[in-house]
Protein backbone atom coordinates (compact mmCIF):
# COMPACT_ATOMS: atom_id res chain seq x y z
CA UNK A 1 0.00 0.00 0.00
CA UNK A 2 2.75 2.46 0.90
CA UNK A 3 4.35 2.47 -2.61
CA UNK A 4 0.99 3.54 -4.06
CA UNK A 5 0.54 6.27 -1.42
CA UNK A 6 4.09 7.53 -1.93
CA UNK A 7 3.68 7.47 -5.71
CA UNK A 8 0.38 9.33 -5.47
CA UNK A 9 1.94 11.95 -3.16
CA UNK A 10 4.86 12.43 -5.57
CA UNK A 11 2.42 12.70 -8.49
CA UNK A 12 0.40 15.44 -6.73
CA UNK A 13 3.59 17.29 -5.79
CA UNK A 14 4.93 17.03 -9.34
CA UNK A 15 1.62 18.31 -10.75
CA UNK A 16 1.72 21.31 -8.39
CA UNK A 17 5.33 22.07 -9.35
CA UNK A 18 4.50 22.03 -13.08
CA UNK A 19 1.38 24.13 -12.49
CA UNK A 20 3.08 26.70 -10.27
CA UNK A 21 6.36 27.05 -12.18
CA UNK A 22 4.58 26.96 -15.54
CA UNK A 23 2.24 29.72 -14.38
CA UNK A 24 5.18 31.88 -13.30
CA UNK A 25 6.92 31.36 -16.65
CA UNK A 26 3.80 32.20 -18.68
CA UNK A 27 3.00 35.31 -16.64
CA UNK A 28 6.55 36.67 -16.86
CA UNK A 29 7.01 35.94 -20.57
CA UNK A 30 3.63 37.38 -21.62
CA UNK A 31 3.81 40.59 -19.58
CA UNK A 32 6.43 43.01 -20.92
CA UNK A 33 6.31 45.00 -17.68
CA UNK A 34 7.87 42.00 -15.96
CA UNK A 35 10.81 41.81 -18.36
CA UNK A 36 13.22 43.04 -15.69
CA UNK A 37 16.30 41.35 -14.18
CA UNK A 38 14.50 40.08 -11.05
CA UNK A 39 11.63 38.46 -12.95
CA UNK A 40 13.91 37.00 -15.60
CA UNK A 41 15.83 35.32 -12.79
CA UNK A 42 12.57 34.02 -11.29
CA UNK A 43 11.67 32.67 -14.74
CA UNK A 44 15.05 30.96 -15.00
CA UNK A 45 14.57 29.38 -11.57
CA UNK A 46 11.12 28.13 -12.63
CA UNK A 47 12.64 26.45 -15.70
CA UNK A 48 15.28 24.83 -13.48
CA UNK A 49 12.58 23.62 -11.06
CA UNK A 50 10.56 21.98 -13.84
CA UNK A 51 13.63 20.30 -15.32
CA UNK A 52 15.02 19.24 -11.93
CA UNK A 53 11.73 17.76 -10.71
CA UNK A 54 10.83 16.11 -14.03
CA UNK A 55 14.16 14.26 -14.14
CA UNK A 56 13.27 12.32 -10.97
CA UNK A 57 9.51 12.49 -10.43
CA UNK A 58 8.58 10.83 -13.72
CA UNK A 59 10.81 7.84 -12.90
CA UNK A 60 9.53 7.56 -9.32
CA UNK A 61 5.88 7.82 -10.41
CA UNK A 62 6.40 5.19 -13.13
CA UNK A 63 8.09 2.75 -10.75
CA UNK A 64 5.72 3.29 -7.80
CA UNK A 65 2.42 3.46 -9.70
CA UNK A 66 3.13 1.58 -12.93
CA UNK A 67 3.49 -2.11 -13.64
CA UNK A 68 6.96 -1.78 -15.16
CA UNK A 69 9.58 -1.41 -12.40
CA UNK A 70 12.58 -1.01 -14.67
CA UNK A 71 14.35 1.79 -16.53
CA UNK A 72 16.75 1.44 -19.45
CA UNK A 73 20.43 2.21 -18.94
CA UNK A 74 20.48 5.25 -21.22
CA UNK A 75 17.23 6.58 -19.73
CA UNK A 76 18.89 6.29 -16.33
CA UNK A 77 21.99 8.14 -17.56
CA UNK A 78 19.84 10.88 -19.15
CA UNK A 79 17.78 11.23 -15.97
CA UNK A 80 20.96 11.51 -13.90
CA UNK A 81 22.43 14.14 -16.25
CA UNK A 82 19.30 16.32 -16.16
CA UNK A 83 18.99 15.91 -12.38
CA UNK A 84 22.53 17.05 -11.61
CA UNK A 85 22.45 19.79 -14.25
CA UNK A 86 19.30 21.17 -12.61
CA UNK A 87 20.95 20.93 -9.19
CA UNK A 88 24.04 22.86 -10.28
CA UNK A 89 22.17 25.55 -12.23
CA UNK A 90 19.71 25.89 -9.34
CA UNK A 91 22.58 26.62 -6.98
CA UNK A 92 23.98 29.26 -9.35
CA UNK A 93 20.49 30.71 -9.97
CA UNK A 94 20.06 31.38 -6.25
CA UNK A 95 23.43 33.16 -6.19
CA UNK A 96 22.37 35.37 -9.10
CA UNK A 97 19.09 36.19 -7.36
CA UNK A 98 20.98 37.13 -4.19
CA UNK A 99 23.25 39.39 -6.27
CA UNK A 100 20.22 40.97 -7.93
CA UNK A 101 18.50 41.75 -4.61
CA UNK A 102 21.73 43.08 -3.09
CA UNK A 103 22.18 45.59 -5.91
CA UNK A 104 18.47 46.50 -5.97
CA UNK A 105 18.36 47.30 -2.25
CA UNK A 106 21.88 48.69 -1.76
CA UNK A 107 21.93 50.80 -4.96
CA UNK A 108 18.28 51.33 -5.98
CA UNK A 109 18.97 54.45 -8.06
CA UNK A 110 21.69 52.75 -10.10
CA UNK A 111 20.05 49.31 -10.21
CA UNK A 112 18.92 49.42 -13.86
CA UNK A 113 22.26 50.81 -15.01
CA UNK A 114 24.27 48.20 -13.10
CA UNK A 115 22.10 45.21 -14.07
CA UNK A 116 20.48 45.20 -17.49
CA UNK A 117 18.39 42.49 -19.13
CA UNK A 118 21.26 41.75 -21.51
CA UNK A 119 23.67 41.24 -18.62
CA UNK A 120 21.19 38.96 -16.87
CA UNK A 121 20.83 36.85 -20.03
CA UNK A 122 24.62 36.50 -20.19
CA UNK A 123 24.81 35.50 -16.50
CA UNK A 124 21.99 32.97 -16.90
CA UNK A 125 23.62 31.40 -19.97
CA UNK A 126 26.97 31.36 -18.12
CA UNK A 127 25.38 29.52 -15.18
CA UNK A 128 24.02 26.83 -17.51
CA UNK A 129 27.39 26.59 -19.27
CA UNK A 130 29.18 26.14 -15.92
CA UNK A 131 26.69 23.41 -15.02
CA UNK A 132 27.30 21.57 -18.29
CA UNK A 133 31.11 21.83 -17.89
CA UNK A 134 31.10 20.64 -14.25
CA UNK A 135 28.80 17.74 -15.06
CA UNK A 136 30.85 16.81 -18.13
CA UNK A 137 34.00 16.61 -15.99
CA UNK A 138 32.27 14.41 -13.40
CA UNK A 139 30.82 12.05 -16.03
CA UNK A 140 34.14 11.79 -17.85
CA UNK A 141 35.80 10.90 -14.54
CA UNK A 142 33.25 8.14 -13.83
CA UNK A 143 33.14 6.72 -17.39
CA UNK A 144 29.87 4.87 -16.70
CA UNK A 145 29.84 3.01 -20.01
CA UNK A 146 32.95 1.05 -19.02
CA UNK A 147 32.06 0.31 -15.40
CA UNK A 148 31.44 -3.35 -14.46
CA UNK A 149 28.01 -3.63 -12.83
CA UNK A 150 27.38 -6.43 -10.33
CA UNK A 151 23.63 -6.51 -10.84
CA UNK A 152 21.07 -4.39 -12.72
CA UNK A 153 19.53 -3.00 -9.52
CA UNK A 154 19.68 0.54 -8.15
CA UNK A 155 18.75 0.69 -4.47
CA UNK A 156 17.66 4.31 -4.66
CA UNK A 157 14.44 6.03 -5.65
CA UNK A 158 15.92 7.48 -8.84
CA UNK A 159 19.10 7.57 -10.91
CA UNK A 160 21.83 9.87 -9.67
CA UNK A 161 25.64 9.77 -9.60
CA UNK A 162 26.08 8.00 -6.21
CA UNK A 163 23.43 5.40 -7.06
CA UNK A 164 25.12 4.39 -10.32
CA UNK A 165 28.61 4.33 -8.77
CA UNK A 166 27.48 2.16 -5.85
CA UNK A 167 25.75 -0.24 -8.25
CA UNK A 168 29.11 -1.00 -9.91
CA UNK A 169 31.55 -3.70 -8.76
CA UNK A 170 34.28 -1.17 -7.95
CA UNK A 171 35.64 0.70 -4.96
CA UNK A 172 33.42 3.81 -5.03
CA UNK A 173 35.80 6.14 -3.17
CA UNK A 174 38.03 7.20 -6.13
CA UNK A 175 34.97 7.91 -8.25
CA UNK A 176 33.70 10.44 -5.71
CA UNK A 177 36.93 12.49 -5.67
CA UNK A 178 36.29 14.90 -8.55
CA UNK A 179 32.50 15.22 -7.95
CA UNK A 180 33.21 15.99 -4.27
CA UNK A 181 35.69 18.72 -5.22
CA UNK A 182 33.17 20.21 -7.67
CA UNK A 183 30.36 20.00 -5.09
CA UNK A 184 32.52 21.68 -2.44
CA UNK A 185 33.44 24.41 -4.91
CA UNK A 186 29.77 25.03 -5.67
CA UNK A 187 28.35 24.74 -2.16
CA UNK A 188 31.28 26.21 -0.22
CA UNK A 189 31.73 28.92 -2.84
CA UNK A 190 28.13 29.94 -3.47
CA UNK A 191 26.56 29.48 -0.02
CA UNK A 192 28.83 31.98 1.83
CA UNK A 193 28.29 34.50 -0.98
CA UNK A 194 24.52 34.14 -0.58
CA UNK A 195 24.80 34.54 3.21
CA UNK A 196 26.98 37.65 2.88
CA UNK A 197 24.58 39.11 0.31
CA UNK A 198 21.61 38.80 2.64
CA UNK A 199 23.60 40.11 5.60
CA UNK A 200 24.37 43.20 3.52
CA UNK A 201 20.71 43.47 2.47
CA UNK A 202 19.48 43.27 6.07
CA UNK A 203 22.09 45.81 7.20
CA UNK A 204 20.98 48.20 4.43
CA UNK A 205 17.29 47.74 5.26
CA UNK A 206 17.83 48.44 8.95
CA UNK A 207 19.37 51.79 8.05
CA UNK A 208 16.39 52.93 5.97
CA UNK A 209 14.48 55.78 7.67
CA UNK A 210 11.19 54.97 5.93
CA UNK A 211 9.38 52.13 7.72
CA UNK A 212 7.24 51.34 4.66
CA UNK A 213 10.27 50.90 2.40
CA UNK A 214 11.94 48.86 5.12
CA UNK A 215 8.91 46.55 5.42
CA UNK A 216 8.69 46.12 1.64
CA UNK A 217 12.39 45.29 1.45
CA UNK A 218 12.15 42.74 4.27
CA UNK A 219 9.12 41.16 2.58
CA UNK A 220 11.12 40.57 -0.61
CA UNK A 221 14.17 39.45 1.35
CA UNK A 222 12.20 36.90 3.38
CA UNK A 223 10.88 35.31 0.16
CA UNK A 224 14.39 34.72 -1.10
CA UNK A 225 15.67 33.49 2.28
CA UNK A 226 12.87 30.88 2.44
CA UNK A 227 13.74 29.68 -1.08
CA UNK A 228 17.46 29.46 -0.25
CA UNK A 229 16.75 27.67 3.04
CA UNK A 230 14.56 25.05 1.34
CA UNK A 231 17.29 24.42 -1.22
CA UNK A 232 20.28 24.17 1.12
CA UNK A 233 18.70 22.74 4.32
CA UNK A 234 18.41 19.08 3.14
CA UNK A 235 21.95 19.21 1.74
CA UNK A 236 23.37 20.66 4.97
CA UNK A 237 21.48 18.09 7.05
CA UNK A 238 22.97 15.29 4.95
CA UNK A 239 26.51 16.71 5.31
CA UNK A 240 26.14 17.25 9.07
CA UNK A 241 24.81 13.73 9.65
CA UNK A 242 27.77 12.34 7.74
CA UNK A 243 30.26 14.49 9.66
CA UNK A 244 28.97 13.43 13.10
CA UNK A 245 28.99 9.78 12.09
CA UNK A 246 25.27 9.13 11.71
CA UNK A 247 24.74 6.43 9.10
CA UNK A 248 21.37 6.56 7.38
CA UNK A 249 19.69 3.38 6.27
CA UNK A 250 18.34 3.05 2.73
CA UNK A 251 14.81 4.18 3.61
CA UNK A 252 16.04 7.26 5.50
CA UNK A 253 18.42 8.18 2.69
CA UNK A 254 15.69 7.83 0.08
CA UNK A 255 13.33 9.97 2.18
CA UNK A 256 15.98 12.70 2.43
CA UNK A 257 16.57 12.50 -1.34
CA UNK A 258 12.85 12.89 -2.07
CA UNK A 259 12.57 15.89 0.28
CA UNK A 260 15.69 17.52 -1.19
CA UNK A 261 14.34 17.04 -4.72
CA UNK A 262 10.68 17.99 -4.34
CA UNK A 263 10.53 20.52 -1.48
CA UNK A 264 12.46 23.42 -3.10
CA UNK A 265 10.66 23.05 -6.43
CA UNK A 266 7.28 22.99 -4.66
CA UNK A 267 8.04 25.98 -2.41
CA UNK A 268 9.55 28.25 -5.08
CA UNK A 269 6.47 28.91 -7.28
CA UNK A 270 4.25 29.14 -4.20
CA UNK A 271 6.48 31.78 -2.64
CA UNK A 272 6.80 33.86 -5.80
CA UNK A 273 3.12 33.63 -6.71
CA UNK A 274 1.85 34.58 -3.26
CA UNK A 275 4.55 37.01 -2.10
CA UNK A 276 5.48 38.83 -5.31
CA UNK A 277 2.97 41.63 -5.81
CA UNK A 278 3.29 41.97 -9.60
CA UNK A 279 2.96 38.23 -10.31
CA UNK A 280 0.05 37.91 -7.89
CA UNK A 281 -1.69 40.93 -9.43
CA UNK A 282 -1.21 39.61 -12.96
CA UNK A 283 -2.51 36.17 -11.95
CA UNK A 284 -5.64 37.71 -10.40
CA UNK A 285 -6.23 39.70 -13.61
CA UNK A 286 -5.98 36.55 -15.75
CA UNK A 287 -8.30 34.56 -13.49
CA UNK A 288 -10.89 37.36 -13.23
CA UNK A 289 -10.83 37.86 -17.03
CA UNK A 290 -11.34 34.13 -17.57
CA UNK A 291 -14.17 34.09 -15.03
CA UNK A 292 -15.83 37.03 -16.77
CA UNK A 293 -15.50 35.29 -20.16
CA UNK A 294 -17.07 32.10 -18.82
CA UNK A 295 -19.88 34.14 -17.23
CA UNK A 296 -20.66 35.92 -20.52
CA UNK A 297 -20.71 32.61 -22.44
CA UNK A 298 -23.09 31.12 -19.88
CA UNK A 299 -25.41 34.10 -20.17
CA UNK A 300 -25.44 33.83 -23.97
CA UNK A 301 -26.12 30.13 -23.77
Where are these regions (language model features)?
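Transmembrane helical core of 7TM receptor-like proteins
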Residues: 1-301
